[in-house]
Amino acid sequence: MESCLSFSSPPPTKKNIQEPVRPNAKFHKSVWGNHFLKYASNPEQIDYDADEQHEQLKEELRKKLVVNVTNERVEEQLKLIDAIQRLGVAYHFQREIDAVLNNLLLFRSNKDSDDIYMVSLRFRLLRQQGHNVSCSVFEKFKNIDGRFKDSLRDDVRGLLSLYEATHMRVHKEDILEEALEFTIYELEQVVKLSSNDTLLASEVIHALNMPIRKGLTRIEARHFISVYQHDKSHDETLLKFSKIDFNMLQKLHQRELADLTIWWEKLNVAEKMPYARDRFVECYFWGLGVYFEPQYSRARKMFVKVINLTSLIDDTYDSYGTFDELDLFTDAVKRWNVNETDKLPEYMRPLFMELLNVYNAMEEELKEEGVSYRVEYAKQSMIQIVTAYNDEAIWYHNGYVPTFDEYLKVALISCGYMLLSTISFVGMGVTTVTKPAFDWVTNNPLILIASCTINRLADDKVGHELEQERGHVASGVECYMKHNNATKQEVVIEFNKRISNAWKDINQECLHPLPVPLHLVVRPLYLACFMNVFYKDEDWYTHSNTQMKECINSLLVESVPY
């Protein structure tokens, strides 16, 4: 589904522009430096014992998944699939999971008809897989007066399962809105009445803060391993497999980071661009949110290079460049020619040159596979975002506060997710993504608009005050307050409402029939999840020396103990 919005930039004018004093953003230095270089210093060592055990355990799990679904096995199968997905190893069993869930659509089980836990789990798993199952299955859990039954309060596991299911809701599903309100209240009561050190209370607290639908797979897998191993009913084969798999992937990610660190150090950002955020490892972490699987290694490396350069360009526009300098850089990117380099100020030249180099390298590599056309889509997306950055610079230098609608037309581009969604496709395998998929993602489908909306409004909510302190174009908060005569609290309420609706759009767009395969549709979803995690209460990317550092350490430094 295509958005009816037009994203052509408004025609700003340059009037009475005075040369500004360069702002001083005062971003903290890189947290990680060249920490990950050490993973390149040792030759790659294969743990043959772990590798062999990994394959044996995988085959055992596969056999458990392919058994015939019967009344007696439905609950067991659904719980196994849920655990496999939450432990981050579903990519090994996608065909088997698809087969089980497809069969489940045809299979009617009476066993779970009055079990809120199983009904909710079945609903969530099917919707996660793109099946448009009806939410009417929850009607049976209501009283005659239209309220959820009091008996549900005694089933904490059932409440938790229903709560997770509500996050798959789309527009006009009132029963799921009611269920969300009901479960949040009841689960908060559980927390109040329980000791926070109990496993169940901890699960509830975690779920209320980060529902499954909106979490990042690798972060949630790391968390769920510790939860699952204390579950008395856990599958020992699955637990062992997930730990080995987590550590094997971690080693791959460490080697990728080592290779990319060599590239990054050559840019010498700390000296050549000291005004910018040096967030190389954090950008890699962003890439892991989009895809962590080994088959996307090349795509991930390309993605990480582009997002790092985009972050530097963003800071050049927001935190350092003068109006005339930014105009020159914008023109250079639009012309996309190495001859433009000499027209740029000295400090901009390394950045512009590396942008061309990275894109040229991608094109050369993809040319061998006959898919170099992909880079042209990536190039146009980069030109689009740089143009949006410049439009915002013009607003700032003119002291212009756009209407909220004007702001969104530019800000949904400058947030970066249109570019990143396109880039996320570029390095994928030849058969994984085709030209029609690039036409789809670059034509502003609703799921992408929704992801951009979540990005922009979440960022504006947590970061606008700091941006205004250091000199920045008016954020969505200021634009909405000025032109709607609203208070900051009213803006937050409005933004939260829009973000909630955007999640419903995302859920709707992930249901069959799909315009492109689900493994492509979900990339904007995963980008939205990143914002939900790292911009929930503050800007973890800019202030990456606290919670972001802890997350990176748990996923990319510390292995899971066996």
Curated annotation (Swiss-Prot):
<dbReference type="InterPro" id="IPR001906">
    <property type="entry name" value="Terpene_synth_N"/>
</dbReference>
<keyword id="KW-0460">Magnesium</keyword>
<dbReference type="InterPro" id="IPR034741">
    <property type="entry name" value="Terpene_cyclase-like_1_C"/>
</dbReference>
<comment type="function">
    <text>Catalyzes formation of valerena-4,7(11)-diene, one of the active ingredients responsible for the sedative effect extracted from Valeriana officinalis root.</text>
</comment>
<keyword id="KW-0456">Lyase</keyword>
<dbReference type="InterPro" id="IPR008949">
    <property type="entry name" value="Isoprenoid_synthase_dom_sf"/>
</dbReference>
<dbReference type="GO" id="GO:0016102">
    <property type="term" value="P:diterpenoid biosynthetic process"/>
</dbReference>
<dbReference type="InterPro" id="IPR036965">
    <property type="entry name" value="Terpene_synth_N_sf"/>
</dbReference>
<feature type="binding site">
    <location>
        <position position="318"/>
    </location>
    <ligand>
        <name>Mg(2+) 1</name>
    </ligand>
</feature>
<dbReference type="GO" id="GO:0000287">
    <property type="term" value="F:magnesium ion binding"/>
</dbReference>
<feature type="binding site">
    <location>
        <position position="314"/>
    </location>
    <ligand>
        <name>Mg(2+) 2</name>
    </ligand>
</feature>
<dbReference type="Pfam" id="PF03936">
    <property type="entry name" value="Terpene_synth_C"/>
</dbReference>
<dbReference type="GO" id="GO:0102412">
    <property type="term" value="F:valerena-4,7(11)-diene synthase activity"/>
</dbReference>
<comment type="similarity">
    <text>Belongs to the terpene synthase family.</text>
</comment>
<feature type="binding site">
    <location>
        <position position="318"/>
    </location>
    <ligand>
        <name>Mg(2+) 2</name>
    </ligand>
</feature>
<keyword id="KW-0479">Metal-binding</keyword>
<feature type="binding site">
    <location>
        <position position="467"/>
    </location>
    <ligand>
        <name>Mg(2+) 3</name>
    </ligand>
</feature>
<protein>
    <recommendedName>
        <fullName>Valerena-4,7(11)-diene synthase</fullName>
        <ecNumber>4.2.3.139</ecNumber>
    </recommendedName>
</protein>
<dbReference type="InterPro" id="IPR050148">
    <property type="entry name" value="Terpene_synthase-like"/>
</dbReference>
<feature type="binding site">
    <location>
        <position position="314"/>
    </location>
    <ligand>
        <name>Mg(2+) 1</name>
    </ligand>
</feature>
<dbReference type="InterPro" id="IPR005630">
    <property type="entry name" value="Terpene_synthase_metal-bd"/>
</dbReference>
<feature type="short sequence motif" description="DDXXD motif">
    <location>
        <begin position="314"/>
        <end position="318"/>
    </location>
</feature>
<dbReference type="InterPro" id="IPR008930">
    <property type="entry name" value="Terpenoid_cyclase/PrenylTrfase"/>
</dbReference>
<dbReference type="InterPro" id="IPR044814">
    <property type="entry name" value="Terpene_cyclase_plant_C1"/>
</dbReference>
<dbReference type="Pfam" id="PF01397">
    <property type="entry name" value="Terpene_synth"/>
</dbReference>
<dbReference type="GO" id="GO:0010333">
    <property type="term" value="F:terpene synthase activity"/>
</dbReference>
